[in-house]
């Protein structure tokens, strides 16, 4: 059981390093796009409210 818990914490530390990784140099031109990508779902949420306001929240 302790082995399983330690394996979980070891693997979770690897995931945090992956999220902070940089793109390879060949893809450096896509850095601005990659920076904006996590915000895109928020735009869809806001679009839903704008759409409902346009149809008077039926």
Swiss-Prot record:
Question: Which segments cross the bilayer?
Answer: 29-49
UniProt GO BP: photosynthesis
Which InterPro entries would you find in this protein's record? PSII_PsbK (IPR003687), PSII_PsbK_sf (IPR037270)
In its keyword annotation, does this UniProt entry include Nucleotidyltransferase?
A: no
Source organism, top-level taxon: Eukaryota
UniProt similarity note: Belongs to the PsbK family.
According to UniProt, the name of this protein is Photosystem II reaction center protein K
This protein's species is Chaetosphaeridium globosum
């Amino acid at each position: 059981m302790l082995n399983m818990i330690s394996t979980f914490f070891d693997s979770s530390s690897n995931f945090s390093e992956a999220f902070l990784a940089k793109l390879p140099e060949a893809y450096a031109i896509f850095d601005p796009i990659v920076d904006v990508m996590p915000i895109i779902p928020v735009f869809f949420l806001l679009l839903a409210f704008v759409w409902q306001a346009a149809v008077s929240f039926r």
